[in-house]
Swiss-Prot record:
GO terms for molecular function: disulfide oxidoreductase activity. Pfam families: Redoxin (PF08534). SUPFAM superfamilies: Thioredoxin-like. This is Thiol:disulfide interchange protein DsbE homolog.
Length: 179
């Protein structure tokens, strides 16, 4: 019979330590914990592509007076579908501009036809180049832009529930109060 040695527990202890650290890292990960390098900078170009029959979003629109939102979305994105009613509500208060990310034209237009179009103007980003320039990691992401075209806040994830109420709305209200 083999004798028990404390060294036999070493591999188990090492594995448990790595598993614990990995779990802790996953649970504490907040997409906004590392702020976007774009905060305080002028919004990058939105490109020149749009969806047929929609108002073209231009770089000049981002520099017009007043607070506005730029939302990166896609019809294939479930969180984008979840936040769509919130965008519709917000569009009654301020301009909401959309950048359709890596979406076939027909799918994007079908989505907007079915669910409503909250966007005052749209850009299309079929290759994802505009999203890269903005530092977007995955849709949906929403940016608060000031009247001079500077990015004030980046919100990664859908604008829903407590996340919307506790993290996004205070930033939006702060931007609106500063105008």
């Amino acid at each position: 019979m083999a004798r028990f040695s404390p060294m036999m527990l070493l591999p188990v202890a090492i594995f448990a330590g790595f598993a614990g650290l990995s779990g802790w890292a996953l649970l504490r990960d907040d997409p906004d914990a590392l702020p976007s390098a774009m905060i305080g900078r002028e919004a990058p170009s939105v490109g020149e592509a749009t969806l047929p029959g929609k108002v073209q979003l231009t770089d000049e629109m981002l520099r017009q007076p007043g607070v506005k939102l730029v939302n990166f979305w896609a019809s294939w994105c479930p969180p984008c579908r979840a936040e769509h009613p919130t965008l519709t509500e917000l569009s009654a208060r301020l301009p909401v501009y959309g950048v359709d990310l890596k979406d076939p034209e027909g799918a994007a237009l079908g989505f907007l036809s079915e669910h409503g179009d909250p966007f005052h103007a749209l850009a299309a980003d079929p290759r994802g180049r505009v999203a890269i320039d903005w530092g977007v990691t995955a849709p949906p992401e929403t940016f608060i832009i000031d009247g001079s075209g500077r990015i004030l806040h980046r919100h990664a994830g859908p604008l829903v529930r407590e996340d919307y109420t506790n993290r996004f709305l205070p930033e939006l209200e702060k931007a609106l109060a500063a105008e």
